[in-house]
Amino acid sequence: MKVFALITLLMIGATGCGIFKKKNSELKSVKIEGTVHKPYCGGAKPSPDVAAGYFESMKFAEYKLYQGADYTEKSEYLQEVRMDISGVVKLQLAPGDYFLLRADKTLSMDQFIALNGPVEEKLYSKSENSCFQEWMRTADLKFTVVNDTVIEFRENAKCWVGTNPCIKYIGPPAP
């Protein structure tokens, strides 16, 4: 009888560990490597390499992680994500669809302008508020998790305005 009880306990323990391992193994390792391409913005005549611009890490960039394919008011917010100094963030996620939204895009328009500063009209041209509202609802990175993966997240900046498509620089060119 003791042998039967011992075998039963061992089988329950092995089965329980197998279930626990299965739940943990459902999470996949996701590494996101973020860089921004910054163009050459004028000045002295550049070499071809300098004229091509350069890539810079998205160091300390802050995003909000949501589950789903597209951003809607019903999108499930999961957590804040902050890139490290190398523009890298490592996550453990279940298989599915996800997207990142810049943290400042979730602010109200007034809060966004206060955080990013007013636009000087003699140097910059702003699009209508509808452009900003659409941009603020657009995911910065969409991805699907199936297995462990590394995702290259690339953005393109414009001279003197960064990655915001609703602002254009109209000031004088660089000397």
Regions found by a protein language model. Give the residues of each.
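Primarily secretory-pathway and cell-envelope proteins
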Residues: 17-69, 105, 109-175
